[in-house]
């Protein structure tokens, strides 16, 4: 089904967004669009993020799904690159984002480059998914090979795969040092073949305490600064800001 919802930008102007081919079942964000509650979610609050950026800032949306984050950020005047690894979702994302000059990339991110077959394709939960081919890339390499511009902000929402994907973002984390909006899926393990989900540090997963060691400050979904140890015991939405980008009053 299709659905139009209204987004109000930080200046108060209202924009009608059209989403196409929404799923009516499964574990996905579509139901929030259908119920018109998308912009009540903590991961879809944009005012604080926009205030951290300048107009025309470059934003990467990793795990773009169908464009629900990319579109509002583009409306706010940012330049978006949307990365979606699952073919069905990528097709829908391109369709939804076509009016907004968003650049779409069909790739998933991991700690190694490989092509796998997986049923984790369109976030359906009925067990009837067809197997799809997923193209995993090492993100630092993908940026270099495709001559992508360095981002000012990176949003990551990849259902636990952040524990592997960030191993392939060393240059991005340590040298480019963007602001991060992290969908942190703590202990979100997967049993789906071809999609490992969360990997513990002891098993080779990325140690998120590295952000603290590298001088990033951690903020929760309410914009409150929190101790980095919070990442050792709960998930949620977090913003990682390099200390040099904190605006001092």
Q: Where do the PLM segments sit?
A:
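Core alpha/beta nucleotide-donor-binding catalytic domains of modification enzymes
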Residues: 87-125
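S-adenosyl-L-methionine
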Residues: 1-101, 128-129, 144-148, 207, ...
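A short, compositionally biased
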Residues: 1-4, 112-114, 212-214
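Short internal loop-to-helix segment that lines adenine-nucleotide cofactor pockets
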Residues: 34-62, 104, 115-176, 188-199
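Active-site donor-binding loop signature of nucleotide-sugar glycosyltransferases
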Residues: 19-21, 107-109, 120, 136, ...
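Conserved acidic-Pro-Pro-aromatic motif
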Residues: 76, 142-249
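Short, glycine/acidic-enriched loop or turn micro-motifs at the edges of active sites
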Residues: 64-66, 87, 111, 158-160, ...
């Amino acid at each position: 089904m299709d659905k139009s919802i209204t987004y109000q930008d930080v200046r108060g102007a209202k924009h009608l967004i059209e989403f196409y081919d929404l799923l009516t079942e499964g574990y996905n964000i579509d139901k929030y669009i259908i119920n018109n509650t998308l912009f009540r979610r903590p991961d879809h609050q944009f005012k604080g993020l926009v205030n951290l950026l300048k107009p025309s800032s470059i934003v990467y949306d990793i795990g773009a799904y169908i464009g629900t984050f990319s579109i509002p950020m583009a409306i706010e005047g940012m330049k978006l690159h949307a990365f979606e690894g699952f073919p069905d979702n990528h097709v829908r994302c391109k369709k939804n984002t076509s009016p907004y000059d968003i650049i779409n990339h069909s790739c998933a991110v991991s700690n190694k480059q490989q092509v796998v077959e997986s049923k984790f394709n369109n976030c359906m939960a009925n067990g009837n998914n067809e197997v799809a081919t997923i193209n995993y890339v090492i993100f630092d390499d993908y940026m270099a090979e495709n001559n992508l511009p360095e981002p000012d902000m990176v949003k990551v929402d990849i259902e636990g795969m952040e524990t592997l994907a960030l191993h392939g973002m060393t240059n991005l984390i340590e040298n480019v040092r963007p602001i991060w909006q992290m969908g942190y899926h703590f202990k979100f393990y997967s049993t789906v073949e071809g999609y490992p989900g969360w990997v513990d540090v002891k098993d080779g997963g990325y140690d998120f305490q590295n952000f603290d060691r590298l001088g990033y400050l951690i903020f929760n979904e309410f914009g409150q600064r929190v101790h980095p140890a919070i990442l050792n015991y709960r998930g949620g939405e977090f913003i990682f800001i390099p200390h040099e980008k904190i605006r001092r009053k």
